[in-house]
């Protein structure tokens, strides 16, 4: 018997939570666009898209301002319920940076010494991480340059990473006045060994894309530069043709001396002249999206959420506690660290005097303006 007698509604519902007010085209902003799905031959597939969320603040290495965070949230939450979207691609503008985290100028000049304000900001930041982890579409991180600090945290919240081989990865908090508790301390142990996770989280060392590929943090590291004959050139600043040297693993480690100096100059000249090509990365992103498109969407997302849940477990347990600590920290070490970094053009130094800081602590000194004056740099003579 037909069920035509049952009343049914057939118009499509709009489940989008946000309007276009959170996106823009002029830096600093978050750019949101839908790009047509293409098959392996480059043919456009009607009615299906990948959603691209791009951090657009290249003058400050794509650090996210408060308004940009809102744009990222809007992009992921709208993509999550957009029936036309197959996958989300999260990237940045230009060849230098995917994202270097929060905007230090904002942190230093506005949020430091305002713990409640920073707590409100962390509500947005936590929502941004959640919007990635909760997106009901696969999320690809297209790393176009350095993925550092908060940029590493939102990057490791994604599902798959395809990277420029010029990119570097790492944290910056303990050196500049914060702690990597916006995701890194929760996510890194799933990617790396516990000792690698510990050292990468606290040392503030920058590791190459090839080193991170070897250590399983990312899926692909691909070249973006060519020589004068049009041949692809792997990042010449790190070892890619040697795995072991004198008993030590050197693959992905930085070169030193004159060789490093020459390689750095060659890379910088290429980037200065905008002589780079992301076609290999984009082809790999397209390939991955096409794989996703040819899977059952419900089964795909159930599988992805099953993997994500491991990352989400500790993040969900302690993200609220982190919010309070980070707000309180804005009254002390964050004021010093972000302030030093933000005034480096004034003082010539981007960090405090760490040894003097520890000496004053050892003396039991009161942490007041006199204390801070002793550890911060001094304005250079004009």
Curated annotation (Swiss-Prot):
This is 6-oxocyclohex-1-ene-1-carbonyl-CoA hydrolase. Its EC number is 3.7.1.21. Involved in the central benzoyl-CoA catabolism. Catalyzes the addition of one molecule of water to the double bond and the hydrolytic cleavage of C-C bond in the alicyclic ring, 6-oxocyclohex-1-ene-1-carbonyl-CoA (6-OCH-CoA) to yield 3-hydroxypimelyl-CoA. InterPro entries: ClpP/crotonase-like_dom_sf (IPR029045), Dearomat_hydrolase (IPR017613), Enoyl-CoA_hydra/iso (IPR001753). It is an enzyme of class 3 (hydrolase). Signal peptide: none annotated. One of its GO terms (biological process) is benzoyl-CoA catabolic process. Belongs to the enoyl-CoA hydratase/isomerase family. CDD domains: crotonase-like (cd06558). Disulfide bonds: none annotated. It catalyses: 6-oxocyclohex-1-ene-1-carbonyl-CoA + 2 H2O = 3-hydroxy-6-carboxyhexanoyl-CoA + H(+). Transmembrane segments: none annotated. GO terms for molecular function: 6-hydroxycyclohex-1-ene-1-carboxyl-CoA hydratase activity; hydrolase activity, acting on acid carbon-carbon bonds, in ketonic substances. Homohexamer. It comes from Syntrophus aciditrophicus (strain SB). Keywords: Hydrolase.
């Amino acid at each position: 018997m037909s069920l035509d007698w049952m009343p049914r509604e057939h118009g499509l519902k709009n489940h989008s939570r946000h309007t276009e007010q959170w996106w823009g085209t002029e830096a600093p902003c978050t750019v949101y666009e839908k790009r047509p799905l293409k098959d392996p031959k480059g043919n456009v597939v009607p009615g299906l898209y990948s959603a691209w969320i791009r951090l657009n603040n290249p003058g400050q290495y794509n650090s996210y301002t408060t308004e940009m965070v809102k744009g990222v949230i809007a992009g992921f939450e709208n993509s999550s319920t957009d029936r036309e979207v197959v996958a989300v691609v999260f990237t940045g503008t230009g060849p230098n940076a995917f994202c270097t985290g929060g905007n230090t100028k904002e942190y230093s000049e506005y949020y430091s010494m305002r713990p409640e304000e920073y707590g409100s900001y962390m509500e947005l930041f936590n929502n941004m991480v959640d919007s990635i982890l909760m997106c009901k579409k696969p999320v690809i991180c297209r790393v176009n340059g350095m993925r550092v600090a908060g940029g590493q945290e939102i990057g490791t919240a994604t599902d798959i990473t395809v990277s420029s081989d010029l990119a570097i990865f790492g944290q910056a908090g303990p050196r500049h006045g914060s702690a990597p508790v916006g995701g890194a301390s929760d996510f890194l142990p799933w990617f790396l060994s516990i000792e690698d996770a510990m050292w990468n989280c606290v040392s503030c060392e920058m590791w190459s894309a090839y080193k991170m590929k070897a250590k399983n943090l990312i899926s692909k590291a691909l070249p973006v530069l060519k020589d004068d004959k049009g041949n692809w050139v792997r990042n010449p600043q790190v070892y890619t043709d040697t795995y072991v040297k004198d008993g030590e693993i050197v693959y992905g480690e930085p070169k030193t001396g004159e060789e490093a100096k020459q390689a750095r100059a060659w890379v910088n000249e290429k980037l200065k002249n905008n002589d780079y090509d992301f076609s290999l990365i984009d082809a790999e992103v397209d390939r991955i999206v096409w794989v996703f498109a040819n899977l059952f969407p419900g089964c795909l997302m159930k599988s992805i959420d099953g993997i994500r849940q491991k990352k989400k477990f500790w993040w969900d347990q302690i993200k609220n506690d982190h919010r309070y600590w980070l707000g309180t920290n804005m009254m002390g070490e964050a004021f010093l660290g972000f302030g030093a970094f933000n005034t480096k053009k004034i003082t010539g130094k981007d960090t405090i005097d760490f040894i003097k800081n520890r000496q004053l602590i050892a003396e039991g000194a009161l942490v007041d303006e006199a204390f801070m004056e002793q550890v911060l740099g001094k304005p250079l003579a004009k």
